[in-house]
Amino acid sequence: MTADTHGDTEPGTRFPGCECDTSSAGGPRLEVQLQWHPGEAMPEDDLSAVLTNVAADARPVTRTKIANSPETRAFLDIGLLLLCDDLLDHRGPDLMDDHDAGTRLFAGLSQARLIERAEHEDARRERPRMLTVGMFRDRWRYKSRYTEDLIAYLLRPALVEHTIHDVAEAAKGLPEDLPFADLVRQMVERVMAVTLDDQLWGLRTVVWVALPNHPRVQMFLKAQYEEWIAYWTVLYERLAGRFGLQLRPEYTWHDVAEVFHALAEGARLRARATGSATALSSGDNVLVGAINMLLPGLFLNPEATTRKP
């Protein structure tokens, strides 16, 4: 049995979508643009709490060790690189090819292709990881189980926490005397950048749109949403306090966070689809404009934003 076929599919498992044209290991290198610099390691969170299928038959202590091993992270990172190749850089099916049926979501994640891509990446590394098919089989018996863990790895809380940390650090660095208009513009620029410049954000969007009823996708998205809302609630109250903005009694800071988060999500999706953030006739980014429009409805004294903090 070859590396392509061994354990590729657990009996009865089906994945939605259509076939895709995959990139070869010899093609141009694609670096995943994360919220940290390319080439740096992913956050060293405890993957044993996230990956439910890796080394599933091993003893708990052994499973934890395998889940957090450099090789396990490497297999998952390579899988994300291949998904970037197939889903984000894909140009669509070849309509002149009778055998090209389009893109299947996880069709390109064969063991052989993972190893081939790992070897291609290792050629650029000072310390090659030397991944093998045997290492893969020690971790995942079926491709479907690897795919489940890859989804969990992509959506895991540590990545959201890292993004929130990036935005939080940017907010802390804003001068205390910064005018309200400039504060809003700078915060919007950072919020848009941490997603639009992030290949993993694009992959997460593809996965949750393609698999909206997947239990683990739903679980991770709910946790991600709640974490963002909790952060925005605290941040907006603190920033509004700089200018003495008084919230209308019928609203809470949680409401403000819900509204602005929904606006930001829509603006990011639109920008991702069109290639740039939408601008209003005033020249403002659409998210900046929406925030300014909402101020009179949310605050008793919106004129306070025109005063220096």
Outline where the language-model segments fall.
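Amphipathic alpha-helical packing segments from all-alpha helical-bundle domains
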Residues: 195-205, 215-244
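An amphipathic alpha-helix adjacent to DNA-recognition modules
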Residues: 76-77, 137-168
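Hydrophobic alpha-helical segments that form the core
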Residues: 200-203, 248-270, 283-294
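Helix-turn-helix
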Residues: 97-150
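C-terminal peripheral helix-coil segments that are non-catalytic and often amphipathic
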Residues: 2-66, 70, 241, 266-309
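Hydrophobic alpha-helical connector segments
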Residues: 162-199, 257
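An amphipathic alpha-helix signature
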Residues: 111-115, 185, 229-237, 257, ...
